[in-house]
Swiss-Prot record:
Origin species: Pseudomonas putida (strain W619)
Entry binding sites for substrate: R27, Q28, A29, G30, R31, D77, Y154, T209, H327
Keywords in alphabetical order: Cytoplasm, Decarboxylase, Lyase, Porphyrin biosynthesis
Name of the top EC class for this enzyme: lyase
Protein name from the UniProt record: Uroporphyrinogen decarboxylase
Cited Gene3D superfamilies: 3.20.20.210
Family: Belongs to the uroporphyrinogen decarboxylase family.
Gene name per UniProt: hemE
Reaction catalysed by this enzyme: uroporphyrinogen III + 4 H(+) = coproporphyrinogen III + 4 CO2
Major localisation: cytoplasm
Recorded metabolic or biological pathway in which this protein acts: Porphyrin-containing compound metabolism; protoporphyrin-IX biosynthesis; coproporphyrinogen-III from 5-aminolevulinate: step 4/4
Lyase is among the record's keywords: yes
MF terms in GO: uroporphyrinogen decarboxylase activity
Quaternary data: Homodimer.
Length: 354
């Protein structure tokens, strides 16, 4: 494979020296970009965009044409796995993702098959290899998946949920059934991420979007235990390089110490954590990724730069920090403001790496 021209993202994740703090944005290929909206209109709908490797490659690269980002992230959706398990993913306008079939009984769980990455999710593997080829070593490519708990919530609720009442009821009424579902999902995520790594992903991130909605005890049992299982089964070296793993539990700031023991190289932080405090707590074990509040991008450029400067100062000197937002960039953000953010990270962080 082509040698990387810019590897500071991978180096920071492995706590190796860097010249400036690397930066990328969750959902950097997304609706805030007019070129993304044009591609989506051309594709017809969101699923057609995801399932066509050429379109997925096109939108993955769009933010890199605009901004000096230090990583690309595969354009896909976390719900590709349940879709490949036969649940029938579709998107309702204004409603978000829905499933034609819902998991409600132990028999439904027993019937689920673990998808084969090549046969059942081949369009994702093709997208990864296409993007990797088109990047031509410019920056590393991140692969990703949802966490078992987060995927389970969509499968049991039938889509997005405010309170996860069905999934949480299952956790307390029938924990054996939920554990069977989570175990199948952990196996599926492991093979899916390993498929992405073999296809060319140079780092992987597990998005545990809804783990932070659990109690502390339930988080350990129903979310973290399964992410730990996945991490232990991942390919950690490929193509002559280490493949770093990032775990991101939104609203997981209370549990950083136990997440840091899960075996990943880095933890993603949402904006409710103070990154300097997180570094003092777990920085000896893992790198940190984050964690500006995405809504800061609605503020004036000077305010964006000030907040970048504050977060950099909070983290302090040395490597082990990948700058990111604390969650995905939102559709109404002015693309110019995203550019201010990315340039500020590079410009203002050099002093911390001398």
């Amino acid at each position: 494979m082509t040698a990387l021209k810019n590897d500071r993202f991978l180096r920071a994740l492995l706590k190796q020296p860097v010249d400036v703090t690397p930066v990328w944005m969750m959902r950097q290929a997304g609706r805030y970009l007019p070129e993304y909206r044009a591609s989506r209109a051309k594709a017809g709908d969101f699923m057609s965009l995801c399932m066509n490797p050429q379109f997925a490659c096109e939108v993955t690269l769009q933010p890199l044409e605009r901004y000096p980002l230090d990583a690309a992230i595969l354009f896909s959706d976390i719900l590709t796995i349940p879709d490949a398990m036969g649940l029938g993913l579709y998107f309702e306008t204004g409603e978000g993702p829905r499933f034609k079939k819902v998991i409600s009984t132990p028999a439904d769980i027993e019937a689920l098959l673990i998808p084969d990455p090549q046969k059942d999710l081949g369009y994702v593997m093709d997208a990864v290899s296409t993007i990797r080829r088109e990047l031509n070593g410019r920056v590393p490519l991140i692969g990703f998946s949802g966490s078992p708990w987060t995927l389970a919530t969509y499968m049991v609720e039938g889509g997005s949920s405010k309170d996860f009442r069905k999934t949480k009821a299952m956790a307390y009424d029938n924990p054996q059934a939920l554990h069977l579902l989570l175990d199948k999902l952990a196996q599926s995520v492991t093979s899916y991420l390993n498929g992405q790594i073999l296809a060319g992903a140079q780092a992987v991130q597990i998005f545990d979007t809804w783990g932070g909605n659990l109690s502390a005890a339930a988080y350990q049992e129903f979310s973290l235990a399964y992410m730990r299982k996945i991490v232990s089964g991942l390919i950690r070296e490929h193509d002559g390089r280490k493949v770093p793993v990032i775990l991101f539990t939104k609203n997981g700031g209370l549990w950083l110490e136990s997440i840091a023991e899960a075996g990943a190289d880095a933890l993603g932080l949402d904006w409710t954590c103070e990154i300097g405090d997180a570094r003092r707590r777990v920085g000896d074990k893992v790198a940190l990724q984050g964690n500006m509040d995405p809504t800061v991008l609605y503020a004036k450029p000077e305010a964006i730069r000030n907040e970048v400067a504050r977060i950099l100062a909070s983290y302090g000197k040395g490597t082990g920090h990948v700058f990111n937002l604390g969650h995905g960039i939102t559709p109404e953000v002015d693309p110019e403001h995203a550019g201010v953010f990315i340039n500020a990270v590079h410009e203002l962080s050099a002093q911390y790496h001398q």
